[in-house]
Amino acid sequence: MNLVYPSEARGKLTLVHHRDSGHGWIAIPKSYVAWLQLHPSTFSYYHHDIVYLEEDADALQLFEALKNLNIEVHIMSNYINGDSIIRAYDRITDVRYL
């Protein structure tokens, strides 16, 4: 997955909203968590270099940070019928470990 920092995206960023029958998450590179000074809850997950921010409070932090940088966000949707594999990933218990 070729992802760039928003500052290199000329003011636009496309993100994927992963949803299943019960919840949803916005996928971002884990480097964005530190770069945007996000503080995800234990309702968010990570797998390799991707963080899956839960769609309620954690994703709102992301959108607010990007808005403050004047970065336009486009969302692509990925719906899974049943449980998403994201639920099997590690939960964020401490941002320092990302």
Regions flagged by a language model, labelled:
Residues 52-98:
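Short, compact, well-ordered microdomains
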Residues 20-47:
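A short, structured beta-strand/loop element
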Residues 14-16:
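Cysteine-centric segments in proteins
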Residues 1-12:
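N-terminal, charge-rich interaction modules
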Residues 10, 46-47, 73:
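Generic preference for well-ordered secondary structure
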